[in-house]
Structures are given as structure tokens and as C-alpha cells.
């Protein structure tokens, strides 16, 4: 019994650089870090865990090093797929639309307002050789057109034969929202073309107006597409009508605008969302009914395409407006 305190003190010395008798400040040399105080004096566990930098030393190395490096790399990749010579731009079968071939193939349009992105999309700058000798090559900027964000892009990716939207054309866009797809349509028609963008809701309408400030070929109209007579003084005759209004009476809305603004033999491109028209029947039945309504309004259907896998229960219908009747 007499020796117990002494032996405990000794044990304390071994355990913590005098955790028992003279409890040496819980850590001998270097407090909790040094050789980790001693939870075993200089034993292997203490050394490995604490070392001379303890937690900061061994763990901090990898944390600051590779992780920081990797993050930097990611940041670099995100600034837009600026491939230069690595990316090859090829024209798509639809004029004004292009394919960027690199690590992955991307649908792109030539940016009407270089340096400006609309919804955070990637931009690709490519040097195009000059047509004359002695003239430096020009940089052309393209914007990636995401088919998951745009019904028209989804239709192009799905293989639409006819688009009616091409460089120099005038397009009436119904249901413009904040201008995501409108900005790409503006790129397709180019500086010689025009896009009349009609949107009824004021909040996305504000974003549409701010986008149009940078693109002189977009004319934003904050008005109800059900009443085309309210904006008839702003719009001339157009070559194509694109509609993405998602309303039960959308066939009527398209017909009213086509009768008022669309040229004879002009194109009609309609995105149909089945659930917005009738959610009680299957999508195919809804699409068939809508196509029949278009026929009754002198719009001859040319093709119908589902937007899977980009959109569920959506289709896109291309038609030609026959003013004199089908």
C-alpha cells in the first residue's frame, strides 16, 4: 500500500510527461502537439499523431496541397470551353446553328453580343483565319445552347428537318420568359434579322428587357399574346412564329398571331406541353388534338417530334401557314 502513490506517480510520468506526480502540464514538451504529450511519452502513436506539427503538420500538407491544386484546376475549366485550336466549329444543317467539336460535341450559336452571357452559359472563343493575306485572324465567340434549358435546342438535337428560323429572318416569339431561348434565336437570325419577343409576366419580362439592351435585334414586348391587336403597331410581317406559351388555349393564341403577323407560307414552330393542355388524357392524345386544331386554323403540319430525353411529355410541331387555306 505504501508504494502505490509512488507507482502511480511513475505511471503518470510515463503517461503524460508527468501526468501523475508532477503532472508536467499535460504534455511534457510541446503540450498537446509535441510528441503528443505523452499519452505514451515518446511512443509511436504520439509521434505519428502529433509529431512536431501535430495535426497541422501531417494533415495540413495534403489539405493545402493537392486539394487546393485540384480546385484551381476546376476553376480554370469552368470559365468557358475556350479551346482555341482544340475546338473545331462546324456548321449545322440549319443555317445559323453550329456544332463545336472538342472533347464533347456541343450545339452553339454565334454570339451577337460578344463578351455577354445571358444565363451563365459557356462561351467558346475561336480564331478564324482572315480572308485576306496580312490581316490578323479574328476571334469569334460562340455560346453553348443547352437542350435541357431550351425546347428549340432540344428539337434541333432531336433532328428537326425544317426550322424556318435562319439568318436574316424576322421571328415572332410568343412566351419569351426571361429570354434564354430568345437570345439564341437572336444569334441565329443574326444582326440582319429581328426577334419580336412577347412575354406577359412582368418579372421575367424585366430580365428579357435587360437582355434586349445588349442585343439590338431583339424587341421585347410585355403584353398578353391573347390580344395581338394591343401590339400590332410594333410588329411588321414576320417569316416565322415560335410559340412556347404552355396554355390550354395555345392553338388559338398561335392562330390569332399568325393571322395578324405571319406571311403566307410562313413557318410555325410550336412547343406543346401535354400537362398544361389536358392532364386527364395521355400525351399522344393531347398532341393529336392540338395538331387538328392547327389544321383548322390554316396551319399545315409538316412534322412532329417528341422532346425526350430533354423534356417529358413535350413535343414540337412544325407547320406551314397557308393563308389561302389548306
UniProtKB/Swiss-Prot annotation:
GO cellular component, alphabetical, reads: box C/D methylation guide snoRNP complex; nucleolus; small-subunit processome
Record-listed E.C. numbers: 2.1.1.-
Q: Where is this region: Disordered?
A: 1-84
Principal localisation: nucleus
**Family matches, as CDD domains:** AdoMet_MTases (cd02440)
Q: Which domain of life is it from?
A: Eukaryota
Q: Which reaction(s) are listed as its catalytic activity?
A: L-glutaminyl-[histone H2A] + S-adenosyl-L-methionine = N(5)-methyl-L-glutaminyl-[histone H2A] + S-adenosyl-L-homocysteine + H(+)
* Localisation: Nucleus, Nucleolus
Post-translational note: By homology to other fibrillarins, some or all of the N-terminal domain arginines are modified to asymmetric dimethylarginine (DMA).
| InterPro entries the record matches | Fibrillarin, Fibrillarin_CS, SAM-dependent_MTases_sf
Question: What EC class is this?
Answer: transferase
SMART domains per the UniProt record, alphabetical: Fibrillarin
What this chain does, per the record? S-adenosyl-L-methionine-dependent methyltransferase that has the ability to methylate both RNAs and proteins. Involved in pre-rRNA processing. Utilizes the methyl donor S-adenosyl-L-methionine to catalyze the site-specific 2'-hydroxyl methylation of ribose moieties in pre-ribosomal RNA. Site specificity is provided by a guide RNA that base pairs with the substrate. Methylation occurs at a characteristic distance from the sequence involved in base pairing with the guide RNA.
Quaternary assembly:
Component of box C/D small nucleolar ribonucleoprotein (snoRNP) particles that contain SNU13, NOP1, SIK1/NOP56 and NOP58, plus a guide RNA.
Write the protein's name: rRNA 2'-O-methyltransferase fibrillarin
State the species of origin: Eremothecium gossypii (strain ATCC 10895 / CBS 109.51 / FGSC 9923 / NRRL Y-1056) (Yeast)
